[in-house]
Structure formats: C-alpha cells, structure tokens
Amino acid sequence: MPSKASVAIVGSGNISTDLLYKLLRSDWLEPRWMVGIDPQSEGLARARKLGLETTHEGVDWLLAQSDKPDLVFEATSAYVHKAAAPKYAAAGIRAIDLTPAAVGPAVVPPANLREHLDAPNVNMITCGGQATIPIVYAVSRAVADLGGVPYAEIVASVASVSAGPGTRANIDEFTKTTSKGVETIGGARRGKAIIILNPADPPMIMRDTIFCAIPEDADRDAIAASIHEVVAQVQTYVPGYRLLNEPQFDEPSINSGGQAVVTTFVEVEGAGDYLPPYAGNLDIMTAAATKVGEEIAMQTLAVSGGKR
C-alpha cells in the first residue's frame, strides 16, 4: 500500500473530533496533528490519547514545525480560516475548509469533486448543501437535453440541539450559500434553500425535501434512475444517507407555477463516531470532507508513486 497523506486537523470542537475518528479509519489519510486554542479542550485530549501530536497554540505553531502536513482540515470559523488560508498556501499545504469562509471552490463529491482535485483550497459548502445538492444534480443531468431544471427548492430539517451558536447566528448565510450551490453545483437555473431547526425531543435525524421543476415531457424513469445512482454514490461515504420513498412526480399545476415537479425525500443518519446519530447534518459534513481528502490523496500519491 502506498504511504498515506499526512493530515492536520485545525479546530478541536465537536466537528473536528468526529472528523478525527473518520480519518483514523482511512486507508489514504493519516491524522498526525490536532490544533486548537483551548488547552482544556476535550477534542485535544481525545486526540492525544489516540496518538496525535496536539497543541493549543494555534495555526502558527503548526506552520512553525519542520514536518508539515500534506493536508489541513479546518473546522474553526470563517474568520479564522480566511486568515490562515494564505499561510497554508504559502507553505504548500492543501486545505479542506469546513467553515463558511469559501476561500476556494465549493465541492459536493458526486457532482463536482473531479473538477477540483487540483485546487489548493476547497470548501465543503453547508450540511444542507451536501445532503440535497446531489439530488438536484441527479435531476439536472437527467433532463439536460430538455433545457435542465428551471427551479429547485430544498428544505433541510435538522435537530435543534445539533445546531450550535455558529449555525444559529448564520442562518441567512446558510440559506444564501446553499441556494447558490443548488444553482452553480446542482445545475438549477434558480435555487432556494430553507432550513428548519426541529425542536422535537427526542431529537429527529436530518430530513430533507428536494423539489425540482422539470420539463413536462421528461423521461421520469431516467430521472428516478439518476437519483438512485447518486444516492448510491453518497452512501459510499455516508452509509446513513437514504431515500425515504421513491421520487414523487406531479403534473403541472397552479401551485407549481405551471411546471411538472419531482419531489425527493431523503434522511441522513450519522455514523455515531463522536456525534450522536441524529446529528446527520454534521456527520455528512465530516464524511464528505473525508471523501474529498481521500480523493485528493489518492491522486497525489498516484502521481508521486506513493512518495511524499
């Protein structure tokens, strides 16, 4: 087996800790460092017990080391990542950004990962985007010859307890960023995103509804087949991602603006590595980030013949 790409995790919170467990299972990535700013962080303590080198002295400590990582996964804040990104680039370190910073292109693995494998910095968009944009992409490609998807709307419902203060403070940014991704990555000419923080107790797992307007004469079997194919692709890195039922097709109506519509319902159950299974919205972010990192590492190691 070729050598693994070395990895640093910047951030020591819940998402970083869940990401750590996924990276430890990878055949292509070797997590060696976790960087935080709180010496009492549970994430840093767990990482130390698992054999990683840890620090609470921040990114500058990492960059001062003689041995530097091939990849950095950052799960801090947009402000922190925007400041750190130029430093990573100057050091020749590829960055996978789990913050809203969007320094580099947004990546949703089934839709556009291959396009950005050489990018020095990639962004994981939003949890709602990772869960729903693959479906919009699946529908868009199935009707591309008929003019594509004129409008797509996604509704992401997540357990309220899984949404931290950062998510709550940035709901508007979430909807704006996800809506843009529905268009630029999913392929819809116009997109809209809605997020619901579900207060149910016990917490409900993430559930998403995806509405796509389609040409009235579109091949519905082809659309359904495309959706199933993309769902299977997502399941390779998020086993808890699944359709709740078959795609539902509706004829043009006043409510749909005179357009035919396909509606897809999905749910996302987390793997329970560190975060609880109901936090599928967070799990899909760490799983997708791991997938992106593995694909980058595979390409890099193949080019270098397994030598770093």
UniProtKB/Swiss-Prot annotation:
Which EC number(s) are documented for this chain? 1.2.1.10
InterPro entries associated with the record: Acetaldehyde_dehydrogenase (IPR003361), Acetylaldehyde_DH_C (IPR015426), NAD(P)-bd_dom_sf (IPR036291), Semialdehyde_DH_NAD-bd (IPR000534)
Q: Which UniProt keywords are present, listed alphabetically? A: Aromatic hydrocarbons catabolism, NAD, Oxidoreductase
Q: Which reaction does it catalyse?
A: acetaldehyde + NAD(+) + CoA = acetyl-CoA + NADH + H(+)
Binding-site residues for NAD(+), renumbered to this chain: S12, G13, N14, I15, S162, A163, G164, P165, G166, T167, R168, A169, N170, N281
GO annotation (BP), single: catabolic process
Identify the catalytic residues.
Answer: C127 (acyl-thioester intermediate)
What protein name is recorded for this chain? Acetaldehyde dehydrogenase 2
